[in-house]
Amino acid sequence: MSKSNQKIASIEQLSNNEGIISALAFDQRGALKRMMAKHQTEEPTVAQIEQLKVLVAEELTQYASSILLDPEYGLPASDARNKDCGLLLAYEKTGYDVNAKGRLPDCLVEWSAKRLKEQGANAVKFLLYYDVDDAEEINIQKKAYIERIGSECVAEDIPFFLEVLTYDDNIPDNGSVEFAKVKPRKVNEAMKLFSEPRFNVDVLKVEVPVNMKYVEGFAEGEVVYTKEEAAQHFKDQDAATHLPYIYLSAGVSAELFQETLKFAHEAGAKFNGVLCGRATWSGAVQVYIEQGEDAAREWLRTTGFKNIDDLNKVLKDTATSWKQRK
């Protein structure tokens, strides 16, 4: 699918000079509150959340090609980011209704693609929970929803980054052996689907197609995939889309994420970058709450910097320019 000149220019603002998207993800809301709540008895305040996002933006965006933030708590951080760092803004409400079947998507009601663009976003990001094996009456609603957002982004001439998280209602633990067995097909089939032109997606933000904790050579316990099988799943993922795609870190450690990118590259996956969140900054949360702002800055300038610098070095050796795919 051909992109407009404006969309291409916007994606360039989100990429480094090599055409690789080395983006920092900090649009976490519910997950961040839960992380913070582990280290304090009272409910995290809006001011606390906003300030932590500002700290991360001030200290780390000089090393990232772009940052993903949410318009609920992240706007002060967007103002604090490095002038050369592009901006993605999240359009979805955080989490999903655990009492309703289907994990249906929902936009932030006060926002639109137009308003996110007016706020300075170079792209709109939307997170969708998707199970290719779910009932069609659930999935047709999700497809229609993504078509609406895609059309909105075309109208505003702003890139649409779709993040897809897979699940299976019959397997409550997506870190389990059972889910590891079905994950490759669920991830790759969802990518194939949302690459169709009708959705007007410009970049896919996706999970790696395997759980690396069950890959031979990485696994500490049970092995679900041999190295060859895992490599084939990465190859199949690359073949599933003509669109640029970037990997999310899914909360794994910085080390495991970097090793995963090396494995993907060796398998032949021509991925175009990352949107890496917790693997880079998660250790700052406890320091911020227990020791305060100055200590958190120090953590970000040392460990946080090392995490993002190591990641950038790995990306240089493993990722390919999105311009080769468009």
Curated annotation (Swiss-Prot):
Pfam families named in the record: DeoC
Alphabetically ordered keywords of this record: Lactose metabolism, Lyase
EC number: 4.1.2.40
GO MF annotations in UniProt: 6-deoxy-6-sulfofructose-1-phosphate aldolase activity; tagatose-6-phosphate kinase activity; tagatose-bisphosphate aldolase activity
GO biological process per UniProt: 6-sulfoquinovose(1-) catabolic process; D-tagatose 6-phosphate catabolic process; lactose catabolic process via tagatose-6-phosphate
Pathway: Carbohydrate metabolism; D-tagatose 6-phosphate degradation; D-glyceraldehyde 3-phosphate and glycerone phosphate from D-tagatose 6-phosphate: step 2/2
SUPFAM superfamilies: Aldolase
Catalytic reaction equation(s): D-tagatofuranose 1,6-bisphosphate = D-glyceraldehyde 3-phosphate + dihydroxyacetone phosphate
NCBIfam families: lacD, PRK04161.1, PRK12399.1, PRK12858.1
Family named by the database record: Belongs to the aldolase LacD family.
Name recorded for this polypeptide: Tagatose 1,6-diphosphate aldolase
Species classification: Bacteria, Bacillati, Bacillota, Bacilli, Bacillales
